[in-house]
């Protein structure tokens, strides 16, 4: 229907929002030359895709990616898809919903679509099915490959992970045999940036703070958000004083990075 934008509509919406901010933020007292984009989990994956989109380069000063390296060579559950493959999957879902064309599909209610999506396989299947598409328009190359080859300049980047998220290993593996796929991807990325002489500062964190609770949860996916945004008091877990100290420091790091491009702020001597 629109060859210039055949897929990745969510990413295009994000680009449109970023463009609006860039053009209008000065009217609200902001600086269009100091825009930081950030995201966690799937949002982090979106940030990676936005960094790779050439039309965004003039607008993005810095980027924050928290546990979001879904587009990485170690995460096979989120495969990269061609436009042809994506269109085939879309046609299969049309048939599952009992429609023959786009016009009929647009007449379906949100409630019906959600019901059929759940029957189709819900989140586990959709995570592997409805991801970004290499459409030759918004996504034209593999981000990791481009960074490794020095084909893309990455702005100052703050990125990190929690040690107990997305761990995979052989059946029956103990903790020492598990592999944290996001950690591998982040180390691969930061090593590539250093190897290619990327002139911008990059900061890698590992969130490894003990998390209290009867369920012994470990350092699970998303747990660091309470700390970055200083919302520990809104959680039922029995956090102690040092947790709040860590939270304040993490929030300061994040704010410093957004303001200056350095987690230590402008007064850092090294």
Positions of predicted regions on the chain:
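Alpha/beta-hydrolase active-site loop
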Residues: 3-27, 82-94
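Active-site rim elements
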Residues: 3-8, 73-81, 143-144, 171-180, ...
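A structural signal for well-ordered alpha-helical segments within the folded catalytic domains
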Residues: 12-19, 45, 84-88, 183-187, ...
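Alpha/beta-hydrolase fold nucleophile elbow
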Residues: 21, 28-41
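Substrate-access "cap/lid" subdomains that shape
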Residues: 23, 52, 57, 62, ...
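Core-facing hydrophobic residues within beta-strands of well-ordered domains
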Residues: 32, 59-60, 202
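Glycine-rich nucleophile elbow surrounding the catalytic serine of serine-hydrolase chemistry
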Residues: 39-49
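Mobile gating loops/cap/lid regions near enzyme active sites that modulate substrate access
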Residues: 164, 187, 191-270
């Amino acid at each position: 229907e629109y060859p210039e934008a055949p897929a990745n509509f969510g990413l295009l919406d994000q680009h449109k929002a970023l463009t609006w901010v860039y053009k209008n933020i000065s009217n609200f007292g902001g600086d269009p030359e100091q825009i930081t984009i950030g995201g966690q989990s799937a949002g982090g994956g979106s940030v990676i895709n936005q960094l790779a989109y050439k039309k965004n380069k003039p607008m993005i000063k810095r980027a924050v990616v928290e546990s979001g390296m879904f587009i990485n060579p170690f995460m096979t559950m989120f495969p990269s898809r061609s436009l042809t493959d994506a269109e085939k999957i879309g046609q299969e879902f049309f048939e599952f919903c009992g429609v023959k064309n786009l016009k009929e599909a647009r007449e379906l209610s949100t409630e019906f679509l959600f019901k059929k999506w759940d029957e189709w396989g819900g989140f586990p299947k959709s995570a592997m099915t409805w991801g970004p598409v290499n459409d030759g328009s918004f996504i034209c190359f593999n981000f990791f490959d481009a960074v490794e080859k020095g084909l893309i300049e990455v702005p100052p980047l703050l990125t990190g992970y929690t040690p107990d998220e997305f761990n995979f290993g052989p059946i029956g593996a103990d903790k020492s045999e598990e592999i944290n796929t996001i950690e591998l991807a982040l180390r691969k990325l930061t090593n590539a940036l250093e190897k290619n002489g990327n002139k911008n500062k990059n900061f890698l964190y590992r969130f490894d703070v003990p998390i209290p609770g009867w369920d012994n949860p470990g350092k699970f996916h998303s747990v660091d958000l309470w700390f970055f945004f200083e919302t520990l008091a809104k959680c039922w877990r029995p956090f102690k004083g040092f947790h709040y100290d860590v939270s304040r420091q993490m929030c300061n790091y994040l704010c410093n990075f957004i303001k200056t491009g350095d987690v230590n702020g402008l007064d850092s001597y090294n």
